């Protein structure tokens, strides 16, 4: 029984197992087609898509899972919203800028007007992101996200 338990534990720790579980979950909720989206006051892009490393004493960020960033830009450029909200998720690696600040720079580089971007306060997890977005909605008169 112990040997079987070890195999189950090792098997569930494999990256392949995690990938299969994620695929199963995401298959049930595919991304919406842009043409089928309605209009929104803002689109929210949550943090958690950058990773980072230190190089010669400075922090460098790199994409880990950028699909939500590019989807937010696409929704904005389609005219379905006029505002992007980025959350300032704090990256746990070194002394880096909050993720929302990095994403804002990247969005501006892609042609988004700075006035169309709102940043939340610094947040450390998804629950804090939700509260920060709610506050921004109230402060900016945003009803539909």
Residues covered by each model-derived region:
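A structural signal for short, hydrophobic/glycine-enriched beta-strand patches
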Residues: 11-145
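Cytosolic-side transmembrane helix boundary signature
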Residues: 1-4
């Amino acid at each position: 029984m112990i040997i079987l338990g070890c195999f189950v534990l090792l098997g569930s720790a494999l990256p392949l197992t995690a990938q299969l579980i994620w695929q199963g979950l995401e298959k049930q909720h595919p991304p919406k087609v842009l043409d089928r989206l309605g209009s929104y006051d803002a689109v929210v892009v949550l943090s958690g898509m950058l990773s980072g490393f230190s190089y010669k004493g400075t922090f460098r960020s790199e994409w880990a899972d950028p699909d939500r960033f590019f989807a937010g830009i696409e929704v904005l450029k389609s005219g379905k919203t006029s505002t992007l909200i980025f959350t300032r998720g704090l990256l746990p690696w070194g002394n880096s800028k909050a993720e929302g600040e990095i994403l804002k720079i990247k969005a501006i580089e892609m042609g988004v007007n700075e006035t169309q971007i709102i940043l939340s306060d610094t947040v450390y997890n998804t629950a804090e992101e939700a509260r920060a977005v709610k506050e921004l909605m109230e402060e900016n008169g945003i009803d539909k996200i």
